[in-house]
A protein has these predicted regions:
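Short hydrophobic beta-strand element within catalytic cores of glycosyltransferases
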Residues: 97-104
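Acidic, amphipathic alpha-helical patches
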Residues: 62-65, 85-88, 117, 128
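A charged, aromatic-enriched C-terminal amphipathic alpha-helix characteristic of glycosyltransferases
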Residues: 140-171
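Acidic donor-binding loop of glycosyltransferase active sites
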Residues: 70-83, 96
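A conserved nucleotide-sugar
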Residues: 18-20, 35-66
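Conserved donor-binding/catalytic core segment of Leloir-type glycosyltransferases
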Residues: 2-32, 38
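Short alpha-helical segment that forms part of, or immediately flanks, the ligand-binding pocket
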Residues: 66, 88-93, 107-108
Length: 177
């Protein structure tokens, strides 16, 4: 994933509305948990209309989708995953927090001991709702998680770093033959 080397994360104002983003891909909604996340987000927005907003997009071309996502603080993605997928990683590279799969096992696999940018949720309405309510009540956490999101992608998913890992793996295979 490519990250903007000049990206800066501004401090969140406690009075700012936390902006949620949900991209819908109709053919994939059922196995991504979009329906559950959407319902929880709608309910939180009703309860905290002055603290949380939700933008939902559907069927956009990729470049328009990325542009639409830019103003978000949090992307709702991959409820049934243990780790962030490419959509979340792209968002995280832009300083957007991922809410979805962020299990400890995922951090252990990549030996990440400090960064915890992802708002990990279990695959249930209650878990998503509770996590969103926490953010509504603690918007001061947004700035830290946004910065950690960028740091996480730079550290573990930078395209040059990943290419070097593939090259090293390939060379080990070739040498072992």
């Amino acid at each position: 994933v490519v990250t903007d080397p000049n990206i800066t994360i501004k401090d969140s104002d406690k009075n700012n509305v936390v902006k949620l983003f949900l991209g819908i891909s109709r053919g994939r909604s059922a196995y991504k948990g979009t329906d559950i996340m959407w319902e929880a987000a709608r309910d939180i927005c009703k309860k905290y209309p002055d603290k949380i907003s939700l933008r939902v997009v559907e069927g956009l071309p990729y470049h328009e989708y990325v542009k639409a996502m830019k103003d978000a603080d949090i992307i709702l993605d991959q409820l049934y995953s243990y780790t962030p997928a490419m959509n979340s990683l792209q968002a995280m590279s832009m300083g957007i927090i991922s809410m979805g799969g962020g299990e400890e096992e995922g951090y252990e696999i990549i030996n990440e001991k400090e960064l915890r940018p992802i708002i990990n949720v279990e695959p249930s309405y209650r878990s998503v709702y509770t996590a969103l309510e926490h953010i509504a009540q603690h918007p001061e956490e947004v700035t830290m998680r946004r910065q950690q999101s960028v740091d996480y992608v730079r550290k573990h998913h930078n395209y040059v770093h990943v290419a070097k890992q593939y090259e090293a793996f390939y060379n080990r295979l070739v040498i072992s033959k």
